[in-house]
Amino acid sequence: MIALALLSALLSASDAAQPQTCEPDRALSYICGMDKPEDIIQIPGTRWLIASGFAPGSGLKLVDTRQRSARSWYPPNAGASSPRPFPKCAEAPSAALFNAHGISLRKIGSHRYRLYVVNHGGRESIELFEFSVDSSAAAPVLEWQGCLPLPAGLAGNAVASFADGTVLTTVLTRPGTSIADFMRGQATGGVYQWRPGERSFTLLPGTELPGDNGIETSPDQRHFYVVAFGWHSVVEFDRWTTSKPTRRFIAPGFMPDNIRWFRDGLIAAGMRLYEPTCGGYRKTVNGVADPMLCHRGYSVARLDLDRGIMRVIATGTPEEHFNGVSSAAIIGNTLWLGSYQSDRLAYRPIAPR
């Protein structure tokens, strides 16, 4: 994920360079028309993959991984429940503005899910939706449930939740800090928490890291995990005592972005740390961080929390039509890759896991 301070420049530069073809590259095939699918997540046990759209009006897409097709999943069903369980906002974001960044799912019933979406369109907020899935071939119908506004001056990045309704969101750069700062190892971000009954998000002391990025909670509800982008690491916190991290896992040769629980561990995806065709490591010039528009290779790694090892399970070299790998999902023998820069979702074979 990237800071909003670079967003407009990056979007205009990226849009201008986007190719028109949707033919496969050397190692990747594509579903096009996605408009920066920064974060992706599978609806468990189904063929459906949810993709965010990190651009104004891009919103959400629902991907049929069997048919290799995608459809717009926004605006939501107009007949959703009322009164809404999260009444802070009077109406859902405008479809023309909805800018979906990080996303997260939580099962709240036998066939019922809640979807959390970091939004930058029209307001800085966590938008909440619900939907049901069944055994039929029908696509699930999205229902808006309200929103949780972020404190003034803050832009969310990733989002996660606990089973008791607690919501966590990361902020990459707080006011007065920059991407160049976290590239130097300085603390720039934080994890903010909202609990049912509270009025607003508050900072969890001790979670201020160099570029707080992707976030995930543990199934046992005891820990959460945060990507420190400036450290190229995944950091573990005890949920109840956040004054300092409990563990830190350094990514092998890449810059993890989003993380997601996968079976008994985490998977992380991101661009390669050292890319010869881009002049090596990411740099700052005159205090400004390289926006990484030069196409870099990528890595996907599995973090074994029991053994404390992060091992690369897939990697790729730069591709002509795809850059900015930011998230991954494994469905069967297929690896899906999201991007904060590209106009498409990528997929490729992967050995069974």
Where are these predicted regions, by residue range?
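Loop/turn-rich, solvent-exposed surfaces of beta-rich toroidal or solenoidal domains
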Residues: 253-318
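Conserved beta-propeller blade signature
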Residues: 48-50, 114-116, 166-168, 223-226, ...
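Blade-level signature of beta-propeller repeat domains, shared across WD40, Kelch, NHL, RCC1
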Residues: 324-353
